[in-house]
From Swiss-Prot:
This is UPF0324 membrane protein spyM18_1033. InterPro entries: UPF0324_pro. Keywords: Cell membrane, Membrane, Transmembrane, Transmembrane helix. It is a multi-pass membrane protein. The chain crosses the membrane at residues 7-24, 28-50, 57-79, 84-106, 118-140, 150-172, 256-275, 290-307, 314-336. GO terms for cellular component: plasma membrane. Belongs to the UPF0324 family. PANTHER family: INNER MEMBRANE PROTEIN YEIH-RELATED, UPF0324 MEMBRANE PROTEIN FN0533. It is found in: Cell membrane. The lineage of its organism: Bacteria, Bacillati, Bacillota, Bacilli, Lactobacillales.
Amino acid sequence: MSTHLRKLPGLLLCLLLALPAWYLGRLFPIIGAPVFAILLGMLLALFYGHRDKTKEGISFTSKCILQTAVVLLGFGLNLTQVMAVGMQSLPIIISTIATALLVAYGLQKWLRLDVNTATLVGVGSSICGGSAIAATAPVIKAKDDEVAKAISVIFLFNMLAALLFPSLGQLLGLSNEGFAIFAGTAVNDTSSVTATATAWDAIHHSNTLDGATIVKLTRTLAILPITLGLSLYRAKKEHDIVTEENFSLRKSFPRFILFFLLASLITTLMTSFGVSAEVFHSLKTLSKFFIVMAMAAIGLNTNLVKLIKTGGQAILLGAICWVAITLVSLAMQLSLGIW
């Protein structure tokens, strides 16, 4: 049997799990399809015994399909629009990202948490939830159970943010503009940002959704420097351990991240010539679906019992990152005169 045919059973299994997860994600956007995909994968893994037939396809989906999803994610980024609208929030975005990464790095040893999980929780909390985890996982060579743990943590605090932030914003007296920036900088995943801003708009009859989404997309750009930095750091560290040859910068660059940048540049260039952003809508949707497929594969490779037993430290780290980002976002708004 050829290599491609050997991958087919596992690929089809991930596809079959992704379809109901996608549907459930549309019904319950506060949770999101990737979380449903991981849950379905982990539940099936408890009873599924034909691993030899599907192993190659599951591995292909969790790696290659995931990287393809990140590349396609670039077609949702118009760099001109993001920078024009998101510049006001840039100091807040930089501050919240730096805060979460420093918290994750600083507390990793104290919590006795593995480096990869701490890194994924840090980037997921600070940049763009599941998409940032999807982009970072191949770069740091994270295991599937580490990815599942980080995604689960991000989901928990996404849900809490969507439920609590509209009331918190009202209690603090945030303006519509202030809440858009708050939701865009302090909520992790795009679907949760949408849910949070929509809840605010329903209460105040406003339109914060567009502003919050643009701020969120501006955060997404941080995928590039963060993943490239992590890639170079890891490659240099591994290089120093195994060899004394000169370090190659070109070989260390993750190609799929460069293709992500190229996709963003193509989108920006074509829209500047009058091409409608709707042209790229199907590619953006395909990117999201590929992420759901990859999360199903990761769920299939994750031991649910072990995840429950070892997830406490990751949840605590996620909670601290979440609170820190929330406080820094509000403090920066106060210092900049937005709030």
